[in-house]
Structure formats: C-alpha cells, structure tokens
C-alpha cells in the first residue's frame, strides 16, 4: 500500500505562524523544535518544571521560559515533549487546567494518548508531529537547509483543521523539506514500541550478550568475543543504514555473506517469530503499558533492578577496558551534560 508524502509546497506555514506555541521540555527534541519554529517565524515559549536544569540553556538561547502551567495558559498550541513517564502528571497538574476551547495539544510520540493516560476534552485538537531522528539531527539538518522526515497524526479534530495544523508545524521544523508522512497514533505507538523491544533495544541487546556468552563459555577470550559480537556491529549497522540489508550483504566478504545466509535462520527461526508476535500482542492490548505505569508508580524499582542486573554483565566490564584503547571512541557516560 502506497503512503502519502507531503512536502513544503503542500503546507501552509502561515497557519503555525499565526499561533503561539509552547514547547514543554527542552531536551533533545525540545530544543530542536523550539529553535526551528522560531527561525520559521513562529512565536515560541518554553515550559519547564520549577528547578529544571534546562532553564539556563533555554534562556541563553533567547527563549521566554515559563513554568509548565504558565506556558500552557499563554499558548494555543502546546507540544508536550517531556519524557513519556512524566507526561500524564504534567498534563493533569499543569496543562489541563489551562486548556481553552480551540487549543491544540501535540505530542512527539503517541503512547499517552493511545493508551488513555491523557484524555483531553472534546474541544481540544490532539495531534502528533514526530521527526524520525534525534533532536540534534533535526536541528542540524534545518540549519543546513534540509530536514528530517516527520510523521504526523491527528487523534481528535473538533475544528476540522488538525491535519493542516500538524503539517504546518512539521514544515516549520524542517520536515517538509524531506517529507511528511501521515499515520495514526495507534500505528506510531505500536510500531515504535515493538521496534524498540523486539529489535532495536531488547532484541539486539540479547543477541549481542548471548553471542558473547557462547564464545566465552567455549573458552575464547572475552576481549575477542567483545570485538566480534559487539564492537563490529556498528560497521554492519552503518552499511544497513546507508543502503539496506542488500547493501550490507554486497559490502561484506563472500564468506560473511554466505555464513549469514545459512546461519541467520538458525538463530532467528519460526519460534522466535512467534515470540515476537507475543511481544506485539502485549503492546497492542496494553499489557506492556500497564507494567510500565506500575513501574513508575512504584518509584521505578523494577527498572532500577533490571538496569543494575544488565549493567553488571561481563560484556560491560570487558568493553570498558577495550574502549580505553580506542581514542576515536566517545564514551558519553563519562561526559557531563
């Protein structure tokens, strides 16, 4: 099924230029949205919680900085870019009491709307603008006269102008230069969570660790296992990123290509696919989200326990030693924000 793709010529920039936009949060996406919107002629203010470490950065960038409630009262378009697990509380305490008829509430990810943690009144436009790249890339591409593709969606449209508003917003942050793709809150939320859990984070992490363990348990040095199962992954991912799986297979040796074809299906087989379907089902029916919410309400205890157990793996200790030998490798864990 072909998808629609919209560009700058399809968007009316004056729509968002005629609104007052509050960006709630000034992290990776927040700073990029705010600066790109401002340079596209949009009036922008930043909403931050009291005591936020981001206040100084936002003020140094020349933005009017308000608390979340003040920003919500001032604006008629509110883009909520705080972490998923904080959004419901911010909405309940600061945004909802200040929403006015005709206001629009936008998101960069659909989780809280799709699973009902946030339920605005019927007179509020609910939309999403989700660049498919990190904030620093969204900003850099905009400055270079380019853009990052964006997804847009409208969940509630009492005024009938939700898509035009979302498209205008997407164009103002540079998305229309690359392409704006309409979707739904359900599709964006489910596919995003599934990709993270089954492939990008959960699946990849377990594949790396298990490969490392197999080699070490067979008597090979942990350093050799680290190089072959983790370090070289970037080379492969870069090739896939640049030109797809076909490009990767074209670029590696015939030995690697042949071995991948005959052994890959032994690692990821029909049983794996069935378990992935189970993960998808848990996302679709809300099982995962209930567990996520319970973790937050429990003070992140489960997350902290999982994090500690995973961080204690031998592969982490091995990597710390080996990365000290690599002057070209940045270790963000040792950098200060």
Curated annotation (Swiss-Prot):
- Write the signal peptide boundaries: none
The UniProt record gives the binding positions of Mg(2+) 1 as 192, 196
**Entry's Gene Ontology molecular function annotations:** ketol-acid reductoisomerase activity; magnesium ion binding; NADP binding
Residues recorded as binding Mg(2+) 2, renumbered to this chain, are 192, 228, 232
Q: What is the E.C. number?
A: 1.1.1.86
Q: Which residues bind substrate?
A: 253
The residue ranges of the KARI N-terminal Rossmann domain are: 3-183
| Protein task | Involved in the biosynthesis of branched-chain amino acids (BCAA). Catalyzes an alkyl-migration followed by a ketol-acid reduction of (S)-2-acetolactate (S2AL) to yield (R)-2,3-dihydroxy-isovalerate. In the isomerase reaction, S2AL is rearranged via a Mg-dependent methyl migration to produce 3-hydroxy-3-methyl-2-ketobutyrate (HMKB). In the reductase reaction, this 2-ketoacid undergoes a metal-dependent reduction by NADPH to yield (R)-2,3-dihydroxy-isovalerate.
Cysteines engaged in disulfide bonds, as pairs:
none
Q: Which family does it belong to?
A: Belongs to the ketol-acid reductoisomerase family.
Q: HAMAP family this protein is in?
A: IlvC
Record flagged with keyword Cell membrane: no
Sequence positions that bind NADP(+): 26-29, 49, 52, 54, 84-87, 135
In this protein, the active site sits at: 109
Name of the molecule in the record: Ketol-acid reductoisomerase (NADP(+))
Against InterPro entries, the record matches this protein to: 6-PGluconate_DH-like_C_sf (IPR008927), KARI (IPR013023), KARI_C (IPR000506), KARI_N (IPR013116), KARI_prok (IPR014359), NAD(P)-bd_dom_sf (IPR036291)
Pathway it works in: Amino-acid biosynthesis; L-isoleucine biosynthesis; L-isoleucine from 2-oxobutanoate: step 2/4; Amino-acid biosynthesis; L-valine biosynthesis; L-valine from pyruvate: step 2/4
Species in which this protein is naturally found = Corynebacterium urealyticum (strain ATCC 43042 / DSM 7109)
The coenzyme or cofactor needed here is: Mg(2+)
Q: Which NCBIfam families match?
A: ilvC (TIGR00465), PRK05479.1 (NF004017), PRK13403.1 (NF009940)
Swiss-Prot/TrEMBL keywords: Amino-acid biosynthesis, Branched-chain amino acid biosynthesis, Magnesium, Metal-binding, NADP, Oxidoreductase
Q: Which PANTHER family match?
A: KETOL-ACID REDUCTOISOMERASE, MITOCHONDRIAL
Q: Which SUPFAM superfamilies match?
A: 6-phosphogluconate dehydrogenase C-terminal domain-like, NAD(P)-binding Rossmann-fold domains
The KARI C-terminal knotted domain sits at 184-329
Name the catalysed reactions: (2R)-2,3-dihydroxy-3-methylbutanoate + NADP(+) = (2S)-2-acetolactate + NADPH + H(+); (2R,3R)-2,3-dihydroxy-3-methylpentanoate + NADP(+) = (S)-2-ethyl-2-hydroxy-3-oxobutanoate + NADPH + H(+)
Would you tell me the Gene Ontology cellular component terms? cytosol
């Amino acid at each position: 099924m072909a998808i629609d793709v919209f560009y700058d010529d399809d968007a009316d920039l004056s729509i968002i230029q005629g609104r007052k936009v509050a960006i709630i949060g000034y992290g990776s996406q927040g700073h990029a949205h705010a600066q790109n919107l401002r340079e596209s002629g949009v009036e922008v203010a930043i909403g931050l919680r009291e005591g936020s470490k981001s206040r100084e950065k936002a003020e140094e960038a020349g933005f009017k900085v308000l608390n979340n409630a003040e920003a919500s009262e001032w604006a008629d378009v509110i883009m909520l870019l705080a972490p998923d697990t904080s959004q419901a509380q911010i909405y309940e305490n600061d945004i909802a009491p200040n929403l006015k008829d005709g206001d629009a509430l936008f998101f960069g990810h659909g989780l809280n709307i799709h699973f009902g943690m946030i339920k605005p009144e019927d007179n509020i436009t609910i939309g999403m603008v989700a660049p498919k790249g990190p904030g620093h890339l969204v900003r850099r591409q905009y400055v270079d006269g380019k853009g990052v593709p964006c997804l847009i969606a409208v969940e509630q449209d009492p005024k009938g102008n939700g898509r035009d508003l979302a498209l205008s917003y997407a164009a103002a942050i540079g998305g229309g230069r690359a392409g704006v793709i309409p979707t739904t809150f359900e599709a964006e939320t489910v596919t995003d969570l599934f990709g993270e859990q089954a492939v990008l984070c959960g699946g990849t992490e377990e594949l790396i660790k298990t490969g490392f363990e197999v080699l070490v348990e067979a008597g090979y040095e942990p350093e050799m296992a680290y190089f072959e199962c983790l370090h070289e992954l970037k080379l492969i991912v870069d090739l896939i990123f640049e030109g797809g799986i076909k490009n990767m297979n074209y670029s590696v040796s015939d030995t690697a290509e042949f071995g991948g074809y005959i052994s890959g299906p032994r690692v990821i087989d029909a049983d794996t696919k069935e378990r992935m379907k189970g993960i998808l089902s848990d996302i679709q029916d809300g099982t995962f989200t209930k567990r996520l919410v319970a973790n937050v309400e429990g003070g992140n205890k489960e997350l902290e326990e999982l994090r500690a157990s995973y961080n204690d793996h031998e592969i982490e200790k091995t990597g710390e030693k080996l990365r000290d030998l690599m002057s070209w490798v940045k270790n963000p864990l040792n950098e200060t924000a």
